[in-house]
Amino acid sequence: AEAIYEQIKDQGEVDLLDIKKQRKKLEKEYDFYILGAWTDKTNANKDMQRFIDQQEIHGKDVALFLTCGVPREHYHADDSINNYIAFMEERNNRIHETFVCQGKVDPKVMIVFKILTWRDPNFIHKVTPDLADMVKESKKHPDPKDLKDAQNCFNNLLKHKISHALA
């Protein structure tokens, strides 16, 4: 979020909010929302979902970004962004752009996965060498390339929106 903010902050009135600290409805409404979250159970995390509903972000123009513990090419990343999109569309929001990149996996998640794998060898997130490798790789993300790609994505989107608004 900070990297995107640094890239776009001079393109208009832009605010960076810490949603964990935002417990009441903002007095200010925005023309456009860029909403970023980390993945939890193939969707935006509960803090972001609560924020969206608390702030009544319904029927708005939005762009979404999401970090996911797996590489972008993994089906879990697609499922996660698609569920986030569906969550937003259920609230009649218009989605102009999405961005997904790999992000860190909380070590506590792996502990839970190991316990659940021990209990049920068919557990959907069974701890395998491949999963362990993905989690190890996730510690490096978002990396400088991920951050630059996110900056470019939203910078280009806003430049396009501004140029069309002025035309």
Task: Please give the residue ranges for each predicted region.
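Short amphipathic alpha-helix
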Residues: 2-4
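FMN-binding flavodoxin-like domain, especially the glycine-rich phosphate-binding loop
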Residues: 7-15, 32-35, 40-167
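A short glycine-rich beta-strand->turn/loop micro-motif centered on a GG-aromatic cluster
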Residues: 14-22
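Short amphipathic alpha-helix with an adjacent loop that forms part of the alpha/beta core around
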Residues: 22-29
